[in-house]
Amino acid sequence: MIQQESRLKIADNTGAREILCIRVLGGSTRRFAGIGDVIVATVKEAAPGGNVKSGEIVKAVIVRTKKETRRADGSYISFDENAAVIIKNDNEPRGTRIFGPVARELREKKFMKIVSLAPEVI
């Protein structure tokens, strides 16, 4: 469950290490974002020589959350950290590698490229 001012780790190789959520996309009254939702964020910490710089405004899709997510079969899934992947305007990832597991819900939300790059889909 991500909201404004939430900080997330980055699970790709764009050079960003941490982002801060500015806005949850999907309507003016939408407060929270879960796995597979798109947010607008600013880069708070970045590695030197990366594709993105500190202070840059980016779009990102959430791939892991600490808050559990309920699935259709009644099971719940949660992760150890809140993490996101930086995406372009056409919902393709900006990086070429994804680190750590991602949730199966991304496949239903049509983020196929992220699912195919991920080392593990849970």
UniProtKB/Swiss-Prot annotation:
UniProt keywords, alphabetically: Ribonucleoprotein, Ribosomal protein, RNA-binding, rRNA-binding
Classification via Pfam families: Ribosomal_L14
Keyword presence, Transmembrane: no
Gene Ontology MF terms in the entry: large ribosomal subunit rRNA binding; structural constituent of ribosome
Coiled-coil region: none
One BP annotation, GO: translation
Keyword S-adenosyl-L-methionine: no
One Gene Ontology CC term in the entry: cytosolic large ribosomal subunit
SMART domains in alphabetical order: Ribosomal_L14
Domain of life of the organism encoding this protein: Bacteria
Functional description taken from the UniProt entry: Binds to 23S rRNA. Forms part of two intersubunit bridges in the 70S ribosome.
HAMAP family according to UniProt: Ribosomal_uL14
Family: Belongs to the universal ribosomal protein uL14 family.
Assembly, per entry: Part of the 50S ribosomal subunit. Forms a cluster with proteins L3 and L19. In the 70S ribosome, L14 and L19 interact and together make contacts with the 16S rRNA in bridges B5 and B8.
Protein's name in the database: Large ribosomal subunit protein uL14
Source lineage: Bacteria, Bacillati, Actinomycetota, Actinomycetes, Mycobacteriales
Gene behind this protein: rplN
